[in-house]
Regions:
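Short flexible loop/turn segments at helix-to-beta-strand junctions
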Residues: 125-128
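A structural micro-motif at secondary-structure boundaries
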Residues: 130-139
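N-terminal/domain-start alpha-helical segments
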Residues: 1-122
Length: 139
């Protein structure tokens, strides 16, 4: 089962996301601020991070920057900041998608599935093995 980290300080939105993601078959953990997010990230393996921008302690851009220093785990930003400048900043930090609030839960669930599908295909392609006679080459 794939594991998703929700980083959202609005408890109503966090609970809504948690409920719908569990219903969709995902394991879910949640953080209320950037420091808690980094603590959970360092102690667990996540397949995807759903990240708000406006967070206490460390904002979502800062969290993304810290994560990208050590991992290419898929990140979807989910935020009320819908301006072009914020979206460009997120994309420059290599987020996989940038979704503005308010959002459609069914569309979000499908975008998460698409990002996870692409991520798993990339990982599978990265572990190819070529065999020739008695030689095996792990790519």
């Amino acid at each position: 089962m794939q594991n998703i980290l929700i980083v959202e300080d609005d408890m109503d939105i966090q609970e809504l996301l948690r409920e719908f993601l569990k219903e969709a078959g995902y394991e879910v953990m949640a953080a209320n601020d950037g420091i808690e997010a980094m603590d959970l990230f360092e102690k667990n393996k996540f397949d995807l991070i759903l990240l708000d921008v406006m967070l206490p302690k460390i904002d979502g851009f800062g969290v993304c920057e810290l994560i990208r220093r050590q991992s290419q785990v898929p990140i979807i930003m989910l935020t009320a900041l819908g301006g072009e400048e914020e979206q460009i900043r997120g994309l420059d930090l290599q987020v996989d998608d940038y979704i503005t609030k308010p959002f459609s839960v069914p569309i979000l669930i499908r975008k998460i599935a698409a990002v996870l599908r692409r991520s798993s295909q990339t990982q599978e392609e990265g572990h190819k093995t070529i065999e020739y006679q008695n030689l095996s080459l792990d790519l």
